[in-house]
Amino acid sequence: MRTRTTRLSLAIAALALVGAACTSDDDEADDTAATTPATDVDQPADTADSVAPDGTTADTTADTDAPDDTAPGEEVQTGESVLDIVQENGVVRCGTRDELPGFAVLTPEGDHVGFDADFCRVIAAAVLGDAEAVEFVDVETADRFTALQSGEIDVLVRNTTYTATRDGAEGATFVQTNFYDGQGIMVASDSGFAAITDLDGVIVCVVQGTTTEGNAASEAARLGLDWEVRAFEDPELIQQAFEAGQCDAWSSDVSQLTGFRSTYPTGPDSLTILPEVFSKEPLGPAVRDGDSQWAQAVNWAVLATIQAEEFGIDSTNVDSFETTEDPSIQRFLGLEVEGDEGAAVLDPGLGLPTDFARQVVTQVGNYAEIFEEHLAPLGLERGINALWSDGGILYAPPYR
């Protein structure tokens, strides 16, 4: 009897241990599920097979058909930089526009000319050694960031303002600003308006989906003026409305207003740009987030135009610097520089050819040449877009 009782006690104890073990496993599993951070969606799923209790293998591969919840602006690693793709394809797909005088216009002959168009060429010259290896893609204002995010274009060079939201939520990475602008207002010369404060109870027309729209409303509120801010899809529609008397004033970046004024049907003298500038509009190229290699390549391509002007190097004299003894210029042009271990060409690891700056200057020009060709004829002055040494704010980091 005692033996049977002992056996029964041992059996009960064994069952208790098994139950405790099972309970412990469940609690541990619950704790693990609660404290393990969610898997980063940017990382590939673990494809290793787990072993089931019956000895078979269970496939733990994540469902690859699940929707991608990556938010705009969140970095997505694809494993290949746009720089590699551009160099493989031999062309830069540059998002721009074809109807903004001074910046980007498609001529009847099919040529893209203008300040922005030339900076597309600057990028191609730096990356590919061929300034004409550009596919110009005309993108609408409302679609420009979608085109950038979808991969339809490699870079956006379309008089686009660098803002916090575009840098964040829109998923763009802005590089070196190539034109510092500000918002202004243009009116008919015979309107009687001489200053922004004269504009009360008027209709101010802007392009929708731009910084201009919000800035105009904010400026009216700041000055206590009654403005009806009317938004149109593109500047061409504003011009039509302006000509039809549906707009009392036209607000945009001063550079854009200057461009449209230069081609206005009744002549530039029929329009006046009021003197006040009421916003900051840093314009420059943008690339997709998450690709630092491509961003730095585009960044240094733009900087090369600024540094070349500072060195006094332009498309007409670049060859004369072949024999320069200035090590800073030697490094910049991809020439050999004497060092402790002999002569060597600087390769800073940008993923660009060592002579990229020389290609930019030879094939397109320095910043001053690009500005003088496209923006000076509109009546725009360098102003703050002059070199830092000439009273402006353009400045290139040391190339070393």
Where are these regions (language model features)?
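Extended ligand-binding regions for polar small-molecule ligands
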Residues: 72-77, 121, 125, 189-193, ...
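C-terminal motif of bacterial Sec signal peptides marking the signal peptidase cleavage site
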Residues: 18-21
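Acidic, polar ligand-binding/catalytic clefts
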Residues: 121, 125, 129, 133-198, ...
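Extracytoplasmic small-molecule ligand-binding "clamshell" domains
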Residues: 76-156, 348, 352, 367, ...
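Bilobed "Venus flytrap"/periplasmic-binding protein-like clamshell domains
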Residues: 93-102, 112-127, 161-163, 181-240, ...
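Immediate post-signal peptide segment of exported/extracytoplasmic ligand-binding proteins
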Residues: 44-45, 57, 61-109, 192-203
